[in-house]
Structures are given as structure tokens and as C-alpha cells.
């Protein structure tokens, strides 16, 4: 699932879970 995060998430995390929400979410 994705959790709120202030920092950018990794490209791999975005591809797997965060979709277009990389700015505020990360995979965990």
C-alpha cells in the first residue's frame, strides 16, 4: 500500500504502487 511521504519516492516505487502520486506517496 502507499503511505503519505513528503519526499519524492523512487521510480521503482512509483511504478509499482504510487502511480501519479509520487510527490506525496511511497510504497511500503
From Swiss-Prot:
Residues with 4-carboxyglutamate modification: 13, 16
GO molecular function: ion channel regulator activity; toxin activity
Keyword set, alphabetical order: Amidation, Disulfide bond, Gamma-carboxyglutamic acid, Hydroxylation, Ion channel impairing toxin, Knottin, Neurotoxin, Secreted, Toxin
Cellular component, GO annotation: extracellular region
Modified residues (4-hydroxyproline): 4
Positions of modified residues (Serine amide): 28
Main location: secreted
Expression (tissue specificity): Expressed by the venom duct.
Paired cysteines (S-S): 2-18, 9-22, 17-27
Localization annotation: Secreted
Main function: Gamma-conotoxins may act on voltage-gated non-specific cation pacemaker channels (HCN).
Free-text note regarding domains: The presence of a 'disulfide through disulfide knot' structurally defines this protein as a knottin.
Similarity comment: family membership: Belongs to the conotoxin O1 superfamily.
Protein name: Gamma-conotoxin-like de7a
Organism: Conasprella delessertii
Amino acid at each position: 500500500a502507499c503511505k503519505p511521504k513528503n519526499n519524492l519516492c523512487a521510480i521503482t516505487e512509483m511504478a509499482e504502487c504510487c502511480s501519479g502520486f509520487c510527490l506525496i506517496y511511497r510504497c511500503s
